C-alpha cells in the first residue's frame, strides 16, 4: 500500500478525463517532464536509458516492442504509456494472460492513478468499465476488437507477457488485436520474445502508424551465474543457505512435488533463529483455518514457503508478502513463477529440465527456461543472481555411490551405476548449457476461426464475411493454415445461414451487409458463454419437483469449467467403493476391471442436458464452440451437508483447496447472476446465500484488497463482483446464509449418526468435548432406544431445527437445537450447542460452546 499522499498522485498530474477544470491534450514534452518528474520525486527511481527511449518512442506515436530482461522495468514503461493516454484524452488498455495478473495490475494502477481512472474487466468482474484505463484479459480485448473493429475506443494497448502470442490454444487473442485495430498504438512486452522481426513487419504493414521500435538491447540489471549439481536437493538448498544465496525458489513441475520438497526441507535447518522469530511475529494474526493452511503454517515457521495455483489466494499472497519482506529463505513452488508474480528471489533451483506438457514428458524449451531462470537476482540487493539445475535422481544416486567409494579403485569397480528408468526423458550438463546459451524460440503465430468470432464480426455491421477473410489473409499464418481457416469460415457462415441466425442485405456499392436475426448477449463469449443456454434449459425443470433447487444447481454446474483435481478425487472414491462392492459380490478380477472403467464421477441430469444442448446448438450455432460438462460439486456438498473443510477431508484434496474455492466462487456468481429471481425457490435462495457466506469466510482477500484501494461509495458493489459480498456493520453479515451453514453442519451430524460413525463424529466435535468415546456412548444409548435415525425430508424440515438469537448482539452467539427424527417419532433426542458467531463467520465452519447430544 502507498501512503495517503502517494495514492492517485500520478493521476492528479493528468487532465481530468471529462476535461473540466484542467488543461487538455498536453504536449509530448509536458507529458515526458511530468511523468519522469513523478518517477524521480515520488517513486525515488532513476530511470534507465531504455525506459526513457521506450517512452519517448510512445510519445512520438510509435509502436514499441519491449523485449527486455526480467527486472528491467517494463512496468514503468507501461505506466508511462497509460499516463500519456490519460494526458491526451485516449483510453488505454493493459492486458495479461491470467486473471490474477490482471487483478494485481488493477490494484497497482488504482494506487497510482486513483480509483476513478482505472477499471477492470475479466469476464466475471466488471469494475468501473468506462474508466480511461482498463485492465483485462487478452481474450476480452480480442473479442472487443472483433465486435467493434475500427470503431473501438482503444487508443493504446500494453500487452504484457506477449510471448503468449505463440501459445497454441490462446495465441489467437494476442494476434487478433494487431490485425483488427489499425487505429491503436501498441506496447508489446515480454522478457522472452526471441526474434520479433516478423511481428514488427506485420504490425507496420497493417497499422495506421507504420513505425515500430524494437528495444531489445537493455542490459540485465542483475547478471546471472549458473551451476549444474549432482548434490541431492536438500544439500543444494542447505549450501545456498549457508552461502547467503537466499531467498531461494525451488522450481517444480507439479504441485505435489513442490509440497514434498518443502516438507523435506523443513527439517534441514534452512532458516536462522532470528528469521523464524520474525516469521512467527509476521504471521501472528493470520488465521490458517483450512487443512492445507495448517500445513503451510508449520512450513512457514521453519522458513519454507509454498507457492502454486492450487492454494487459496490469501495463502499465496501471504507467501508473496513474506518473501517481499525478506522473511522467507526458501519457497517451493511451480513454474507459475515465470508469469509475472512479484516475488524477490536471489537463487532459482530447477528440480528438473523436463516437464509434462499435457500429452508427454519433454525437455524445457529455451523460452520456458529463460522465463523461470530470469527471475533470479534482486535488483537493488544482489550483484548477481544464481540459477542451479539439479541432475536427474538416478545420476545423483550414482554420484552418492561413487563418493562413498572414496576413490578406492576396487570399491569403484563394484559400484553398480543406475540407469535412467525406461521411458524417462533425461537431461545432463550439456542440456543445461544449451538452454543457457539458447535464445528464446521465434514465436509461432496461432489463429482460429470460431462461431463466436464470426458473430462478433457480424455484430459490428457491414460486410462481416469480407472482414473475416481479411483477418485470415492479413494474419501471420502459413498459406496452408490460411486455406484451412477459410474453409472453416465457409462452414461457420453456412451453418449460420442455414439456421437463419444471420442474414444479408445487398448494398448499393455491390457489397453485402450482414446482420443477426437475434440478440447476442452483451457479455457474450466472455468467461460464462453458456449462460444463455442455462436460462433456456431452466424451462425444462418442474418448479414443483422436490429436487428443483438441486437440479438448477446441476444445470449451472454443467456450464462451469471443470475443477479437475476435485473430479478426479470423486472418481477415485467412486471406483474404490465400486471395487469393494464387486469384491464382496464375488466378481472375478477381469470382470471387476471391465466394470471399473465405466465408473466416473457423478453427472446429474447428463442425458437431459445433452439432449437439450444438442437442440440448443442447432438453434444457436455459436454454442458449437463450447461444450457442457455435467458434474456434481455444489450439489454434492448440499446433499451431504458438507462445509468446505469437511468436503476437503472427505475427498483428501487439501492440496487443491484453492481449486475448489475458485469453483465454488464461480458457482456462486453463476447462480446469483444468471438464474432470474422468478426461477428461484426458497431452497435455492438458501443455497445461494450459503455459498456466499462460505466463499467469503474461506478467503475474503480480493474483497479486502478492494476495500483498501481508496474510499468510494460504490465499494461494496464493486467488491461483490470480485468475490462474495463484503462485511456489513452487523454481528451477522448474511443471516440467511449463516443459518443454512449451521443447519447443514447440524444435519451432517445426523447423517453420520445414521451411518453409525463415531470416529467421524468425534473428529468433528472433539474440540467442544464430544470426541470418539463420547460419541460411541451416545450412539450406544440412542440405538438402545431407537431402531434408526431418519435422514429424509422430514428429518431436515425446519420444524426440527430451532434457533434462539437473543444473545446475538451482546454475546455474539446463537443457541441452536437439531432434533433427531427417530424411528419411533418420539423426537426426544437432540444435538444442542451455542454457536460462536464471530469464529463461525471467520472460518466458514460452525464453532460451538456448551455442546451436547442427549435426550
Language model segments and positions:
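Conserved two-lobed SF2 helicase motor
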Residues: 130-146, 302-316, 322-342
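Conserved interdomain hinge at the start of the Helicase C-terminal
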Residues: 227-253, 260-263, 317-326
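Non-catalytic terminal extensions of ATP-dependent helicases
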Residues: 305, 324-325, 408-411, 415-759, ...
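Helicase-associated low-complexity/disordered flanking segments
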Residues: 1-64, 90, 270-301
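Conserved P-loop/Walker A NTP-binding site and adjacent catalytic elements of P-loop NTPases
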Residues: 38, 42-229, 247-272, 307
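Conserved segment of the helicase C-terminal RecA-like domain
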Residues: 347-350, 354-357, 362-407
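Conserved C-terminal RecA-like helicase domain
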Residues: 93-95, 103, 110-119, 255-330, ...
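A short beta-strand element within the Helicase C-terminal
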Residues: 154-157, 330-355, 384-390
